[in-house]
């Protein structure tokens, strides 16, 4: 936001602080000032001149001019501009002058003719092309007729102004206007604000007799139109052009410039239509139809869908609501009747449309961040009066509108003790009340309780904490005392904090590196690996990519895998421990659940001269989980073919003591392609379940004093039977001495029946006191094989 210091002083007449002092004060009061610049910076010796005579140089486009610059003698200056004429007031760069790009003007000869200066166009004195009302080929700039010859040009073009560049955060969009900035400065210094006023005179003829307004979407709370007839389109007066250029806006014509001026002053976007081009006496505001097309002011045809808001006349779109007008109804030099629009458009809808079409405008950015809902009518009336003032014509009586929307002003209460407790201060009742009055709040004091009625221009204030922040800002952050927090309790880690440290150690011992991802992601990524789920979305996100609280952490890890692999780091092993956010049926605030997730990709062992590379696979990822869950009594890996975004044949749901705790597996190839990454394996675990199911203590057992016994069994089974099923049946045989079951061979193919596979297991029996006899070993193995045959229809080979 570019704030003109001259304009600001008009709105806060008693302001005595310099721009440098203002920069420091605003920065320490909550609104960052990026810097203060002046349009005249780096320029010198630029004066008003008047062309006394002009003579063409034969066979060229050049002219020999004699220019009065207020000196005893006129200056001879050679100029090639096509619009040079006698009597014209111009910008003269004298010999020795500095113009744009630090170029120094020297005495010279052009086509053998001596030239003692330069007649300048606006771009030649540093006016950026984006805000320059003239094209370079149009020629030199003509100064106002009342400009005094010999005077410096800077005051006539307001180039002696100082521009304060504000960096406005989304929560302080109220400062995206001159009025908002004035209220802020007035509050900081305790000065009254004097906003601009204009008296609107209406004609006797009613606007409602010529036009009607209808709104068929709930995304437009109010839509207002004023009709102005008999206008004459022309250039705006120089003061208005100057003010717009200093605000970073390009002057167009008197009508369009008024709408832009009001946008900068009030923060209220307006749009002006050529009413004669409507071909209808009704404006209909609705959602666009899929496939509907319109050509916007930038003369680009755009195909719309039902998420876009359109303003239509005669059944056709004449504006992309809140974003840009249509080319078919734009103001031209022939326009005589103007339909002036002021409305409230849904910010989320505007943001989506703006991003979809890459149309970022001053209007759309303000609708996205929020505008003062209480001054829509005031801004419309001000603009109508100003158009008549500059372009003539008459304002038809009455505002034609969809409904007379008025915002409800919230009331927020706080006590003096709460303010002082939060800030560590000892402020008096009078001091805090004065601060609220300076902010323009309506204040009622009852005992030590303040009840503040918040004006519509401060839509960011809703709760007690907001009032505390306002007091801190205006009182001055630098004036707050430095205090240390006091506590009666000794510090101690919680059970979850201790558990996180244990888990972190386990993951890092498996070769994984910790990363920290964003809690805010896109709505799509928030639920990508967990299916359909209600999510929590910010009302005013900083960016579209950071608007929804994540319901899982894996998309963030995949983004990091992509980042590394794009930089030739193919082997990635990372994990994150953090919170995910799940819907809370009893509260608008989500439930925070501690989770861990990891992602691995590439090789476990790289290829070398004496061995092949060993890539990561499902079993490697599963092994990391098994190591992590080694202390748990019962851990199951159940095959899953319907886990969102995961490979249906290489994914397992993880259960701890019968409770679902997470999943592990390969991401679906389509998901990997979307993230532009190689084959990647991931896991996600609920740390709350892990902590709750963690054994209370580890029971010590003596090291066995007798030798373990090993027996191998080979099984012919259906191909669909899993290793987990087999291990579960073996353990269900309840052989007390069975200490380990290990799969050491799998075969499927030649010499085996179709649909069958062979799996070989090593069984380890560990007696505690006495060595097992052959009969005991045989009985144990037979019990296991019998159980396998009965429950899984297995053939013992």
Curated annotation (Swiss-Prot):
Q: Which UniProt keywords apply?
A: Aminoacyl-tRNA synthetase, ATP-binding, Cytoplasm, Ligase, Magnesium, Metal-binding, Nucleotide-binding, Protein biosynthesis, RNA-binding, tRNA-binding
- Specify the species: Lactococcus lactis subsp. lactis (strain IL1403) (Streptococcus lactis)
**Source species, domain of life:** Bacteria
Residue span, B5 domain: 407-482
How does the cofactor attach, per the note? Binds 2 magnesium ions per tetramer.
Please report the stretch or stretches of sequence annotated as the tRNA-binding domain: 40-154
Tell me which EC number(s) this protein carries.
6.1.1.20
Q: SMART domains this protein is in?
A: B3_4, B5, FDX-ACB
Q: Where is the FDX-ACB domain?
A: 704-797
InterPro entries registered for this protein in UniProt? aa-tRNA-synth_II/BPL/LPL, B3/B4_tRNA-bd, DNA-bd_dom_put_sf, Fdx_antiC-bd, Fdx_antiC-bd_sf, NA-bd_OB-fold, Phe-tRNA-ligase_IIc_bsu, Phe-tRNA-ligase_IIc_bsu_bact
The GO annotation for biological process reads: phenylalanyl-tRNA aminoacylation
Q: What is its main location?
A: cytoplasm
User: Could you give a GO molecular-function term held by this entry?
Assistant: phenylalanine-tRNA ligase activity
Subcellular localization: Cytoplasm
Catalytic activity entry: tRNA(Phe) + L-phenylalanine + ATP = L-phenylalanyl-tRNA(Phe) + AMP + diphosphate + H(+)
Q: How does it assemble?
A: Tetramer of two alpha and two beta subunits.
Q: What is this protein called?
A: Phenylalanine--tRNA ligase beta subunit
SUPFAM superfamilies from the UniProt entry: Anticodon-binding domain of PheRS, Class II aaRS and biotin synthetases, Nucleic acid-binding proteins, PheT/TilS domain, Putative DNA-binding domain
């Amino acid at each position: 936001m570019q704030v003109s210091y001259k304009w600001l002083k008009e709105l806060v007449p008693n302001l005595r602080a310099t721009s440098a002092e203002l920069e420091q004060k605003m920065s320490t009061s909550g609104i960052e000032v990026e810097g203060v610049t002046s349009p005249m910076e780096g320029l010198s010796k630029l004066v008003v001149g008047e062309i006394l005579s002009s003579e063409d140089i034969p066979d060229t486009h050049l002219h020999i001019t004699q220019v009065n610059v207020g000196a005893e003698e006129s200056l001879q200056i050679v100029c090639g501009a096509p619009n040079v004429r006698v009597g014209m007031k111009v910008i003269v760069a004298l010999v020795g002058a500095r113009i744009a790009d630090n170029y120094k003007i020297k005495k010279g000869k052009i086509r053998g003719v001596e030239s003692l200066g330069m007649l300048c166009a606006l771009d030649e004195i540093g006016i950026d092309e984006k805000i320059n009302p003239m094209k370079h080929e149009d020629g030199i700039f003509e100064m106002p007729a009342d400009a005094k010859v010999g005077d410096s040009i800077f005051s006539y073009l307001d180039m002696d102004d100082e521009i304060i560049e504000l960096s406005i955060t989304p929560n302080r969009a109220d400062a995206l206007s001159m009025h908002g900035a004035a209220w802020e400065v007035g509050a900081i210094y305790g000065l009254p604000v004097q906003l601009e006023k204009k008296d609107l005179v209406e004609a006797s003829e009613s606007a409602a007799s010529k036009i009607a307004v209808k709104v068929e979407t709930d995304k437009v709370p109010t839509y207002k139109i004023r009709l102005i007839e008999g206008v004459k389109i022309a250039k705006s007066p120089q003061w208005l052009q100057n003010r717009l250029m200093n605000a970073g806006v390009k002057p167009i014509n008197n009508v369009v410039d008024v709408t832009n001026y009001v946008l900068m002053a009030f923060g209220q976007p307006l749009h002006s239509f050529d009413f004669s081009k409507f071909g209808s006496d009704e404006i209909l505001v609705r959602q666009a139809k899929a496939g509907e097309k319109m050509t916007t002011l930038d003369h680009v045809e755009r195909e719309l869908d039902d998420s876009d808001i359109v303003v239509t006349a005669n059944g056709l779109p004449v504006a992309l609501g809140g974003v840009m007008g249509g080319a078919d109804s734009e103001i031209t030099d022939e326009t005589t009747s103007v339909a002036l629009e002021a409305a409230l458009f849904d910010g989320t809808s505007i943001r989506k449309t703006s991003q979809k079409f890459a149309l970022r405008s001053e209007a759309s950015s303000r609708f996205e961040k929020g505008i003062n809902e209480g001054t829509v009518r005031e801004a419309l009336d001000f603009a109508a009066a100003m158009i008549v003032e500059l372009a003539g014509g008459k304002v038809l009586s009455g505002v034609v509108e969809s409904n007379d929307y008025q915002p409800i002003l919230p009331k927020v209460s706080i006590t003096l003790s709460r303010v002082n407790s939060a800030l560590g201060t000892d402020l008096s009742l009078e001091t805090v009340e004065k601060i609220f009055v300076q902010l323009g709040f309506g204040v009622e004091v009852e005992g030590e309780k303040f009840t503040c009625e918040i004006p519509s221009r401060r839509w960011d204030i809703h709760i007690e904490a907001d009032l505390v922040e306002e007091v801190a800002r205006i009182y001055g952050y630098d004036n707050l005392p430095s205090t240390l927090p006091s506590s009666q309790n000794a510090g101690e880690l919680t059970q979850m904090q201790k558990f996180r440290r244990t888990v972190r150690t386990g993951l890092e011992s498996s070769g994984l590196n910790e990363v920290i991802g964003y809690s805010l992601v896109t709505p799509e990524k928030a639920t990508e690996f967990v299916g359909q789920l209600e999510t929590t979305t910010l009302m005013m996100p900083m960016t579209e990519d950071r608007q929804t609280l994540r319901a899982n952490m894996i998309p963030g890890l995949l983004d990091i895998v992509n980042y590394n692999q794009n930089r030739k780091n193919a082997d990635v092993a990372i994990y994150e421990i953090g919170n995910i956010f799940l819907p809370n049926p009893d509260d608008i605030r989500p439930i925070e659940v501690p989770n861990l997730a990891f992602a691995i990709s590439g090789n476990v062992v790289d290829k070398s001269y004496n061995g092949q590379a060993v890539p990561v696979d499902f079993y490697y990822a599963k092994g990391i989980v098994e190591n992590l869950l080694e202390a748990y009594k019962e851990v199951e890996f159940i095959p899953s073919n319907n886990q969102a975004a995961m490979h249906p044949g290489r994914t397992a749901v993880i259960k701890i003591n019968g409770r679902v705790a997470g999943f592990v597996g390969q991401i679906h190839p389509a998901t990997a392609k979307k993230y532009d990454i190689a084959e990647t394996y991931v896991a996600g675990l609920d740390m709350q379940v892990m902590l709750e199911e963690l054994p209370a203590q580890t029971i010590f057992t003596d090291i066995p004093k007798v030798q373990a016994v090993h027996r191998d069994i080979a099984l012919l089974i259906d191909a669909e039977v899993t290793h987990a099923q087999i291990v579960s049946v073996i353990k269900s045989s309840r052989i007390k001495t069975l200490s380990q079951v290990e799969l050491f061979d799998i075969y499927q193919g030649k010499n085996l029946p179709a649909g069958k596979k062979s799996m070989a297991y090593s069984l380890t029996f560990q007696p505690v006191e006495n060595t097992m006899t052959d009969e005991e070993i045989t009985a144990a193995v037979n019990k296991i094989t019998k159980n396998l045959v009965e429950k899984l229809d297995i053939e013992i080979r």
